[in-house]
Amino acid sequence: AQQKGMPHSTLFIAHSEATRRNIERLFRPELDLGVISMDGAMSLQTLKVTTLNTYCAEVLNTEISETEFLDRDAFESKQTQLLYTLEALQESLSNELPTHKEFMSKGFLDYLNSEDHWVIAEMLQHEISVKIKGRAEEDEAKYYKLPRLRYGLPVENEGDRVFAFLAFRNYRRRLENSGQFDTDDIVLSALGQLNTPIWRRRRAREGFDSIFIDETHLFNLNELSVFHRITKSDHLFPIVYSADVSQSLGDRGWDDETFDEAMGGSDQAGNSQPTVFKSIFRCSPEIVDLAFSVTSSGATLFTNFHDPVAAAN
């Protein structure tokens, strides 16, 4: 675009504020030289580096105040969500389970009784985000009709779903009491704003020519649904994303095919061009040497360390 003297707007999405600052630092030399600019004043080629939370807040404009965010950082926000979900789960296990267990499946009851509460809370958080909020729009009747996710909470019958929805209500009450909105509330509200006649008219002018997404595996399906609505074109999606599907923290069961479908629809999935990295670029040789030294030492590494507790005694 620069060689042709054509305008080009790029959006670079990071998952957390720390990552955003690091990415912006990498582009700082080009920004200082005026090769690209943040606002279009110095160059026709513009770059916007931000987090999805911040971008969605800009879309919502003045409809949400700073104090209503769980946290501006998506990672911290999701950790707070998990704590609220754990509290809601424990309340439901204590108050609702005794009266509802006779209507619930044996498999789901065994899961609730045998699995660690933190693990169940993570699965419930995913159920709330993707199914109850994302697909059912917090409608109880719609949720009961939805099929179980392949990698989701192991609900088998309507009684299981009733219990999960009661846990969601306990979670929602905690958000209401604190006067805050979680990441999914903000993203889904922004999606509503991006599906209006006003945005469809403005899209060709205010959308992005290209979008780059870092650590895509950390985003859930609700969050990924935003990106194909903010490109200039509504049928071509010039999106570049990096993903480590072995982590799959944002959503359960991510693989290469489901990523392609989420980032452009099944009709666009065949047009993607994957690049598989077999080398590790994150670690410098010094860090690799240190890691090798630690693993080679085994348990003997810790035998010569000073014990401050023993000295205190």
Task: Specify the residue positions occupied by each region the protein language model found.
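Alpha-helical structural motif
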Residues: T19, K48, L52, K78-Q81, ...
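Conserved P-loop NTPase motor core of helicases/translocases
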Residues: F27-P29, V35-E91, S189
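Walker A/P-loop NTP-binding motif
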Residues: A1-K4
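Coupling/switch/interface segments within P-loop NTPase motor domains and analogous charged loops
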Residues: F69-F181
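Conserved helicase motor core of SF1/SF2 NTP-dependent helicases
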Residues: P7-S9, H15-E30, G34-S37, T50-C56, ...
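Short glycine-rich substrate-engagement loop in P-loop NTPases that contacts/grips substrate
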Residues: G179-A190
